[in-house]
From Swiss-Prot:
Sites where the protein binds Zn(2+): 143, 147, 226
Active site: 144
Native species: Streptococcus sanguinis (strain SK36)
GO biological-process terms attached to the record: proteolysis
Recorded name of the encoding gene: htpX
Family per similarity comment: Belongs to the peptidase M48B family.
Keyword field: Cell membrane, Hydrolase, Membrane, Metal-binding, Metalloprotease, Protease, Transmembrane, Transmembrane helix, Zinc
Name the record gives this protein: Protease HtpX homolog
Primary site of residence: membrane
Cofactor stoichiometry and binding remark: Binds 1 zinc ion per subunit.
CDD domains: M48B_Htpx_like
Record membrane topology: Multi-pass membrane protein
Segments crossing the lipid bilayer: 14-34, 39-59, 158-178, 197-217
Length: 298
């Protein structure tokens, strides 16, 4: 059951990534059709822009992410229990030992960053070290180490980059339509044809709806990787109850006092903002109740 769930989550993630590239290509084709006189040219342009966005974001240093979240690196002497748990989980996962950081915040939480295991780091708040016992903390750190082993940070970064590229291209297309109009001219043979009108409408719909669709796909990818990391943590610790207890404590916690931007919020094991209302629809994390239910059925 455990390995079936892990395999299923991986398949869903790759299907969502394929959908992401398809969405980017569709938007590129729409822009190419309207302004470049070539749908293929638009697709190539969109893919190049997406690749540039992803490349820049992937190579953002671990130190920058940690600084943005107010984390400081600690030694084995400063935080022996946390350090040894990270060391143990990394050994079981067969990855290099990540660097260990602490965030001074009373709200329990943790996150990992790094585009590959060789430059990865794990951070935990002072709050999580105070309220969790060793089994629960092992579940949390196992979750973060699983993100590193599964290259989740890289996958999530690609998803964020593609969503950003799609939003930028859609905004650019909207401004071009507003200030300069489309490529429609008397020289286009398909201008007044039924096919031309259909293609025009489809292109406009793609440009308008692409950012929303990109956001939804990005959120779906993030949620699938959270389920996968939960299951992978149990694979490492062989203790689903420890992970369940940790999640239940996280569910009862208060929002973090330290300001967390939207990009960093997706890295944490539990949503650090805990905003309500309609914003719940755009959470990067699945509901903890659903995560717990899946763990109980392993």
């Amino acid at each position: 059951m455990l390995f079936d769930q892990i395999a299923s989550n991986k398949r869903r993630t790759w299907l969502l990534l394929i959908a992401f590239f398809g969405l980017l290509a569709l938007l590129g084709a729409a822009i190419g059709y309207l302004w470049l006189r070539s749908a293929v040219g638009g697709v190539l342009l969109a893919l190049i822009i997406g690749a540039i966005y992803a490349g820049v974001m992937i190579f953002q240093s671990t130190e920058v992410v940690m600084a943005m979240n107010g984390a400081r690196e600690v030694s084995e002497q400063e935080a022996p229990e946390l350090y040894h748990i990270v060391q143990d989980m990394a050994m079981v996962a067969q990855i290099p030992m990540p660097r260990v950081y602490i965030v001074e915040d009373p709200s329990p939480n943790a996150f990992a960053t790094g585009s590959k295991p060789e430059n990865a780091a794990v951070a935990a708040t002072t709050g999580i070290l105070q309220i969790m016992n060793r089994e629960e903390l092992e579940g949390v750190i196992g979750h973060e180490v699983s993100h590193i082993r599964n290259y989740d940070i890289r996958i999530s970064t690609i998803a964020v980059a593609l969503a950003s590229a799609i939003t930028m291209l859609s905004s650019l297309a909207g401004r071009m339509m507003w200030f300069g109009g489309g490529r429609r001219s008397s020289n286009d043979r398909d201008n007044d044809s039924g096919l031309g009108i259909i293609l025009l409408i489809v292109s406009l719909i793609a440009i308008v709806l692409a950012p929303l669709a990109a956001t939804l796909v990005q959120l779906a990818i993030s949620r699938q990787r959270e389920f996968l990391a939960d299951a992978s943590s149990v694979e490492l610790t062989r203790n689903p109850q420890g992970m369940i207890n940790a999640l239940l404590k996280l569910d009862r916690s208060e929002p973090m006092e330290h300001h967390v931007d939207d990009a960093s919020a997706a890295l944490y094991i539990s949503d650090p903002k805990k905003e309500g209302g309609l914003k719940k629809l755009f959470y990067t994390h699945p509901p903890i109740s659903e995560r717990v239910e899946r763990l109980r059925h392993m």
